[in-house]
């Protein structure tokens, strides 16, 4: 065999081998590909099935929010009809999505898309939050006296925190050391130490009972909705002081369909440059410049229904009002709307972004529109 033949033989064998087993680099690339999805839990507007039915609607963020599938869920009332969804959160450590309804907390495995367990808790359930390490859940009762601290793996109660405040909205800080607890019957925002699960501070008082709220990434400021205000207030999470009172200019208050307050929903864009505020009566999102204090009103976006919640994509490009529009943050234009299998409009106050590599969640957003700048400028 001459030199040319000896050189060609390995190449020929390689070509034959690739033809038999396939081109492996493509297979490895497909296995490691990360897909970005928006998980929309319904019924996420009270128990209204006309806004998407019952279950989890999964949308492909990179494919113009195309509906990919519907995942069945539990959360039924005693009469067998779907109960109001109250909150949603995700744990990377358990690879599970957690959903609260009026009566129960359910854990659904993201790989199998099956319910691992569903448990009822004394006093019901409201908007939960999961620790950054995915191991601990702060679970409010349904506007009752206490929060349950729950093991995310088993659903067992670790401790109860009594505040007598009408437990409602709950948010873990990004660094995992503190949880922020808002009750419907108090004008202050409570702070719990996650090492001891004890209340250590109250922020405020604000001008009325605290409704939805958000925080910045460095956990120094909170932005709160309060009853009776078309606008928001700002508090100092370190000192506990109320700092600013901001009202929407150019719009009047009026009757609202849900929640009983003019502004129910507030969020910071991930870069913390803007505050986005819900205005139910006027069916608007109002945008404020957060690079100055107090924030300055910039623009308003008209929506198809009354908004009651707002959060954002992890990359800071899109806003997700509960009315189901997808809004480009930079241009402030609506780029698409969420629809179900039949083309009907989908709306929900309980949505979360999940990045999946195969059947494993590798990165998650939050149902709250929280700031994601971790250091004070």
Give residue ranges: language-model regions:
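Predominantly soluble domains enriched in secretory-pathway, periplasmic, or organellar proteins
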Residues: 18, 23-377
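Bacterial N-terminal signal peptides that target proteins for export
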Residues: 2-12
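Hydrophobic helical h-region of N-terminal Sec-dependent signal peptides
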Residues: 12-18
């Amino acid at each position: 065999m001459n030199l040319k033949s000896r050189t060609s033989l390995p190449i020929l064998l390689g070509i034959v081998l690739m033809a038999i087993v396939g081109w492996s680099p493509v297979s490895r690339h497909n296995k490691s590909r990360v897909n970005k999805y928006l998980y929309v839990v319904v019924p996420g507007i009270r128990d209204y099935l006309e806004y998407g039915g019952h279950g989890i609607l999964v949308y492909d963020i990179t494919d113009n929010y195309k509906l990919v599938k519907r995942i069945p869920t539990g959360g039924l009332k005693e009469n067998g009809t779907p109960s109001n969804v109250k909150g949603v959160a995700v744990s990377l450590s358990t690879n599970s999505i957690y959903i609260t309804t009026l009566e129960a907390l359910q854990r659904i495995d993201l790989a199998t898309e099956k319910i691992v367990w569903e448990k009822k808790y004394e006093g019901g359930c409201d908007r939960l939050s999961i620790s950054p390490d995915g191991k601990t859940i702060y679970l409010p009762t349904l506007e009752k006296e206490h929060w349950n601290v729950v093991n995310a793996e088993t659903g067992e109660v670790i401790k109860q925190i009594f505040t007598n405040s009408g437990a409602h909205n709950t948010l873990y800080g990004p660094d995992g050391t503190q949880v922020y607890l808002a009750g419907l019957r108090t004008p202050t925002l409570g702070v719990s130490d996650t090492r001891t699960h004890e209340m250590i501070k109250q922020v405020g008082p604000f001008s009325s009972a605290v409704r939805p709220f958000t925080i910045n990434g460095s956990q120094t400021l909170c932005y709160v909705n309060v009853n009776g205000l078309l606008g928001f207030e700002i508090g100092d999470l370190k000192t506990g002081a109320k700092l600013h009172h901001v009202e929407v200019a150019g719009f009047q208050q009026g009757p609202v369909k849900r929640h009983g307050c003019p502004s129910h929903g507030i969020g910071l864009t991930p870069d913390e440059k803007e505050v986005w505020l819900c205005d139910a009566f006027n069916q608007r999102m109002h945008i404020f410049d957060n690079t100055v204090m107090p924030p300055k009103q910039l623009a308003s976006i008209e929506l198809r229904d009354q908004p009651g919640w707002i959060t954002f994509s992890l990359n800071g490009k899109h806003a997700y009002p509960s009315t189901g529009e997808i809004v480009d943050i930079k241009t402030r234009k609506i780029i698409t709307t969420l629809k179900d299998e039949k083309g009907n409009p989908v709306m929900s106050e309980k949505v979360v972004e999940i990045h999946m590599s195969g059947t494993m969640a590798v990165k998650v957003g939050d149902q709250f529109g929280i700031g994601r700048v971790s250091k004070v400028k």
